[in-house]
Amino acid sequence: METKPAIGTEDSPGLQENSRIAEQLNRYSNLLESQGGDGFRIRAYRNAAARVAELRQPLRTLYQEGGGAALIGLPAIGRGIAAAIAEILTTGRWQQLDRLQGETGPEDLFQTVPGIGPALASRFTEQFDAQTLEDLETALRNPRMKVSGLGPRRRSAILAALSGRLEAIRRIRAPRRGGHEPPVQLLLEADAIYRTRAAAGKLRTIAPRRFNPEGKDWLPVLHLTRGGWHLTLLFSNSARAHALGRTADWVLVFCHFEDEPEMQFTVVTQRQGPLEGRRVVRGRESECARYWAGQPVGN
C-alpha cells in the first residue's frame, strides 16, 4: 500500500520556512507595486505567496525529493518563481528581492559558500567584479583570474561547492525548447528609456546598502513590460563601476519572458573600436554592431 508524505504541523520548522518564503514573495510583490511594476507580475507573486502559505508539506522536502519539477508542479508556481524558491532554499538569499530592497551587495551571498569568509568575499567583488554566484563560478574557472589568499586546493573546493549548489538551480533556469534571449533592440531601447527618465528625475529611487554611507535614495529603478518580456533596470552599483567612475553609465538589465526564470545583461558605452560611443550589450557586441548598422539582428 502506497504511503502518503507526512503532513507538517503549523509550528514545524519546514512549515515555518514555507511561511518565511511566502513572506518574501509577498514582499517582492509589494516592492514591485510601489516601484510601478507590471500588474501581471505583482499578481503572479502574490498568488504564489498565497499558495506557499497554504501548503501543508515543507517546500524543502518537496525540493529535496523531487527537485525543480516538484516546485513547478505546485499551483501558481511557474519556472521563474520555482527558480526563486530554489535559490532561497539553496543559498538562504534571493537576489531579486535583495536588489529591489537595495541590498545588492554580493559579499553576504558569497559567504554562504563553504570556504569563503568576509575578506575573501570582498576580494572576489573587488578583483573579479563578481556580483552573483554564477559570476563567481565563471571567474574561478578562468585560470588567469588570480586573487590573494586563494590557493589551488581552496579554489577547487570552492568551485566544487559552487557547482553543487548551482546545478539544481540551473536545471530549473534552463530555457525551454524554443526559449530565447531578449532581442538587443529591446535591451538597447529599454536602456535608453531608463537613462532618459533617470536623468529627468522621473523614476522611483532606492537606497542601496553598498557605497551609500548616508543611506540616501539615489539609485533609480525602472520596471518595463514589452511583448511578454518583463524588465527591471538599475545603474550598476558594483565596486568596479565605482572605481572606474561608470555608475551612471553601466546599466544592469534583469529580464524574463512570461513565467521563465530571470536573465541578466549589462549595457555600457563602448570605449573603443568601431562602436566607440555607442551603447552595447556586453557579450552581444556583434548583434549590437548589426543593430547600429541598420542590419537584421534576429530574435
Regions found by a protein language model. Name each.
Residues 1-99, 164-299:
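Structure-specific DNA junction-binding interface
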Residues 80-87, 118-126, 154-159:
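Catalytic DNA-binding helix-loop module of base-excision-repair DNA glycosylases/AP lyases
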Residues 111-119:
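Short, solvent-exposed interaction modules
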Residues 126-130, 137:
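Short, positively charged, Gly/Tyr-enriched micro-motifs
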Residues 130-132, 144:
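Hydrophobic or amphipathic alpha-helical targeting/insertion segments
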Residues 139-157:
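Conserved glycine-bearing catalytic or ligand-binding loops at nucleotide- and phosphate-handling centers
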Residues 152, 156-168:
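Long, contiguous binding/interaction regions
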